[in-house]
Structures are given as C-alpha cells and as structure tokens.
Amino acid sequence: MTRLLQPFVLVVTALLAAAYAYPAARLATGPWERGALAIPFVLIWIVPALYWTGSRDDEESWLDQAAHQASYLSMAWVSFLLVLTLARDILLFAASVLQSERTHAVIAQAGAPAVLVASLLAMACGAATALRGPRVEKIAVRVPGLHPDLQGFRIVQISDLHVGRSIRRGYVERTVERARNLAPDLVALTGDMVDGPVERLAPHVAPLAALAEGGRAFFVLGNHDCYSGADAWIAHWRETGVRVLQNEHVVLRRGAATLLVGGVVDPAYRARRPEISLQDAPSADFRLLLAHNPKLAPLGARAGFDLQLSGHTHGGQFFPWTL
C-alpha cells in the first residue's frame, strides 16, 4: 500500500472520492436515502481506489483481472453519472431563477432516477462498443495539387490500443487482420500502444510485427508508452521491424513522387518540436507528420507539414473531460 502515499496517487484518489461523493449527495433527498445510497457509492469507489494503490505482484491472477475490469467499469459509470448530475443541477438552478415551481418540482422528482438510468445505459453502450472490437473508419483526404503518383495512397492508422490487462493478443490479432485486409501502403502507429512493460506485454503485441513487412510501419511514442518504459519499447519495436520516429523523418518514393514521413515524440518523453523532424529534410511532394497529441497540429502546419495523424483523444471525448 506504499503507492497510496505517492502524491499523484493521493490526488487521483481524492478526485475520485469527490467524483463519487457529489452524485451520492445530490441524488438523495433525505438523510436515510443519503445513507442508503452512500453505502454502494463507497463500495464502488473502493474498488478502483484499492486497485490503483494495491500490489502488482500477480497481475495475471483472476482476482487482479476482476478488480481491473470492475475498476474501469466503475470509473466509466461515474464519468457519465457526474456529468449528468451536474446537468440536472444546472436545470434545477435555471428553474429556480426563472421561478418555475412546476418545472423545478418535476426535475427534482424525476431527475435522480433519470440520471441513474441514463448513466447506466451509457456505460453499457460504451462497454458493448469496446467489446465489439476495432472498427474501421475510412476517410478520404483530398489534397489539391497532389502528385499523380500519390493518388490513391492508402494509410492505415492504428492508435491507442492500450494493450494491457483489458486488451490482449486476440484483440490485437483482429486489429492486424483488418488492417492487412485494407492493403495499406503505409501503417501509422500513433502512440499509446501499450499499458505495461515489454517483458509482460511483448507476446500480446507480437501480431503487429506482421504490419512491418516492407518497412511500411512507423511508430511514434504516446504518453502511455512513455509511462510503460519508453526506451525498452523503442528497442522492441525496432526489433520487430517497425520504424520508430523520434523527432526525425524518412523519405519514401512511389513512382516519381516523394513522401516525407516525420514523427515527433510525446512530451512525456522528450521535447516535442515538429520542425526538428524536418532538419536537413529534402523537398518532397507531400509531408506527413505522425504525432500522438493532436494539439501539435498548429506547430506542424507552421513547420510545413501537409497532414498530421494523431491519436490520444480515443476518437473524441465529451465535456468536461475535453478540458
């Protein structure tokens, strides 16, 4: 339990406690209801709190796996519950300001059950979406004046797999199979591939090596890759044939056209400056930047890149988690 005393863990645990306590206090009206509702909320909060502060001696045990799944489901639920509770309270405040007693009474009476049901449904939908596996989304990027030999160039981007206790080898195999079926000219691995050390997760990410055939797969670090041991993972990806870009670039040829692929590291590992990746770069018909964090886009554009591929946001988030 020494991890509990670490400042970061203390802060996260306190924030979790507040996130669970606020809905529990606001959704119950009387003291008996508050007490009855507080018990399950405390129990649900304890699961992730103990999981994140406990031992990591046996991460593959069924008990650890169960605690892991329960903790993430718990936090997913409270992320919806907290936002919906805040929305309900804003509506109550608006009804009070407008002196609409009827509206206030309806929201006060029906709001709590509606919030609980809606948050559980949202969590269930999210879990079902995750269990379905990777989804292919095809996006056509139209580039005025693109060199004819680069027309139809196909890039497959894979990002934020977070291979670890939840995402295992089977999920990675399905991802690789779908990627190969798309017949890509280039594979962009834009960070956060793992959540754990090489010695534990190497067998689970092994299928990704199949995408490196012909030197077409490129990888840039994400923040979670850095937390998981950046140097060890960089060495591992290079051993598999994946080309790791750390504030550097490579130039590919397709017919008479040239494609420059630049990559920047995540700030969790080292300074991120897209212009560094263009140092001593020749002219190219198209410049592609791989960066885990999309906030680098303005810097990338100023540096002279035509397109940036990023991850980090998991396909988009909802307020206030976008702050």
Model-derived features with residue positions:
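Alpha-helical transmembrane signal-anchor/signal-peptide segments
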Residues: G133-G145
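Soluble catalytic domains of enzymes that build or remodel membrane lipids, polysaccharides, and related
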Residues: R142-L323
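A broad, low-specificity signal marking well-ordered, structured residues that form hydrophobic/aromatic
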Residues: A122, I139, L259
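Non-catalytic terminal accessory segments
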Residues: M1-P134
